[in-house]
């Protein structure tokens, strides 16, 4: 099963933490939030996750690259949005990602 992880937002409610760190990489108990999510997705046998990015995309790209190289239980792919599209917009422009899936998260 595949999943969308909507991580492109500005994280305004988490400021000042998100002035320099994207919200999906804010540390919780010493680990980025994205690492906690990956643990959950692995437990639920998600095979591939599309992560949308916009604000501070480079640290997220680095996380994706390192995760794919070291853990790799779930394949992570990025979809960069030059302009934020909202939840529905992200799913719409990436519908081919789940085209042959019966279900997706």
Language-model features and meaning:
Residues 2-5, 27-105:
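Conserved N-terminal catalytic core of the sugar/cofactor nucleotidyltransferase
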Residues 15, 23-26:
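Pre-signature/interface helix of ABC/ABC-like ATPase nucleotide-binding domains
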Residues 1-19, 44:
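N-terminal nucleotide-binding beta1-loop-alpha1 segment
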Residues 18-20, 75-76:
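Short glycine/proline- and charge-enriched loop/turn segments
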